[in-house]
Design a protein with these regions (language model features):
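Rossmann-fold dehydrogenase core element
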Residues: 100-117, 137-142
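N-terminal Rossmann-like dinucleotide-binding module
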Residues: 1-42
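Beta-loop-alpha module in the N-terminal Rossmann-like domain of NAD(P)-dependent dehydrogenases
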Residues: 31, 44-104
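Acidic-histidine catalytic/liganding microenvironments
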Residues: 19, 56-57, 121
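Predominantly a Rossmann-like dinucleotide-binding segment in NAD(P)-dependent oxidoreductases
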Residues: 118-210
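Short active-site oxyanion
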Residues: 22-26, 60-62, 171
């Protein structure tokens, strides 16, 4: 596990622990105490750097649960180290980074997966079956809405990186909206070819009272 924040704590680690075919053996987080807490709870060792973790022979695959800006860097390093990768969404912050990750996976013969977990929801899988069978007919419009209380109600850190543009790079559209962008393409079996989007930052402030630098509302057509 690289990155031991909230998504690792509530999704990745509990689900690996419940899977008899998986064993978590190593952790890295910039906050070492956080990694040590997870190791104490689930077993395994703490590594001083993600390079140390990737160099371990007993690591077959890694979950990358770090800030958006570091997804491509760490994923690519893991693939070249011969590890399979499950990277949290968004895949990366530029198209070039995404392409470099795919190239690294192909070049090293390793699996690269992005955490678009809504594809595996039983309701969505059933909808996919109905759409593919033609029972529903042609889809003319598709409307999806997703919202939550915001990173301030989610992150383990009061000063969450989600509000730091240098780390998050993007905002609500990439952190939340990406689920629906992927789901639409999965359900319909078609790729998005044209988009129009509006992203805005309302009067939202970080834990120190400063206006946040990333969008917290988005509309995409």
């Amino acid at each position: 596990i690289i990155g031991c924040g909230k998504i690792a704590q509530v999704r990745h680690l509990p689900e690996y622990a419940a899977n008899p075919n998986a064993q978590v053996v190593a952790y890295h987080d910039k906050n070492r105490a956080r990694a040590e807490e997870m190791a104490a709870q689930y077993g395994g060792v703490v590594c001083d750097s993600y390079f140390d973790l990737l160099n371990r022979d007993d690591v077959d695959a890694v979950s990358i649960c770090v800030e958006n800006r570091s997804h491509a860097e760490i994923s690519t390093a893991a693939l070249y180290a011969g590890k399979h990768v499950l990277c949290e969404k968004p895949m990366a912050v530029t198209l070039a980074e995404c392409e470099s990750m795919v190239a690294a996976a192909e070049r090293n013969g390793r699996h690269l997966m992005v955490g678009h977990n809504m594809r595996f929801d039983p309701v969505h899988r059933r909808a996919k079956q109905l759409l593919d069978s033609g029972v529903i007919g042609d889809v003319i419009t598709f409307r999806a809405v997703l919202g939550n209380a915001g990173p301030e109600g989610w992150s383990v850190d009061e000063g969450t990186w989600f509000f730091d543009k240098n780390k998050a790079a993007l905002g609500a559209l990439s952190d939340m909206g990406i689920h629906k962008v992927d789901l639409i393409q999965y359900l319909l079996g078609q790729k998005v070819i044209e988009t129009t989007a509006k992203v805005v930052t309302l009067n939202k402030r970080d834990s120190e009272g400063n206006l946040i630098g990333v969008d917290d509302n988005a509309l995409c057509i």
